């Protein structure tokens, strides 16, 4: 059973759940439907787990060529490949069924879109054949917070658009940093990521440009009236620091160590933004004016329902 758990990549699921919560609480604006949140979290976790299992199934040949992945479950033959594929499909069906039964069709379609991009477009073709695989794949990585948001709003509004842009832009330097400090692995497996095809210097330039765009997108949540000034300060400071780390790459003597630091801080950055949009959202006042709101209380919600 342990192997069937490991193949779902629990760490990736947990990281995505943080962003799902960010989008969900942002859209809830203090009026949290606990049952809906749990159903959304479990449903999208199953869909993500399905994608991870099927990605492992598809990548088992190239995983054997990379030091980082050569000990994965399917590479070592700890689970039959056919069983893994069936397991992956069942997880996906269960996740979509739960979302269909408890959320709305927009959430279901967004989940299917993210799954199709990751498994169909990225894993099956783009990862092995195109330098643009990271760019297209970023859409699937940006889907979870948008799904969380739309599970509440049932509307693909400006808030959903901004979330999609923020998390898509974040994916790029995050993924490029991995590609740099794992450059030998990607080269050995002939995966055409940007550092392999264009070199590390070109990748550094792309990283800086994407982080600049990310900074602008991140503050748009406040400028568009979705989050308060506390979010703005945290997003601004942490994003600028991340940009500073990226610029430091031009002077580094060790690209692998620098890229690993950039990667680790990218996780801190997106986690901080997800937390802050959860607790420093804005809600429309009765007269139509946007006002800052504090962290919603589940206890208060239960009293309200009762």
UniProtKB/Swiss-Prot annotation:
The answer to whether keyword Cell membrane applies is yes
Question: Which Gene3D superfamilies does the UniProt entry name for this protein?
Answer: UbiA prenyltransferase (1.10.357.140)
This chain is encoded by the gene named ctaB
Q: What does this protein do?
A: Converts heme B (protoheme IX) to heme O by substitution of the vinyl group on carbon 2 of heme B porphyrin ring with a hydroxyethyl farnesyl side group.
GO terms for cellular component? plasma membrane
Q: Which PROSITE patterns match?
A: UBIA (PS00943)
Q: What is its EC number?
A: 2.5.1.141
GO MF: protoheme IX farnesyltransferase activity
**Coiled coil regions, renumbered to chain:** none
Show the catalytic activity.
heme b + (2E,6E)-farnesyl diphosphate + H2O = Fe(II)-heme o + diphosphate
Q: What is this protein called?
A: Protoheme IX farnesyltransferase
Q: Which organism is it from?
A: Methylobacillus flagellatus (strain ATCC 51484 / DSM 6875 / VKM B-1610 / KT)
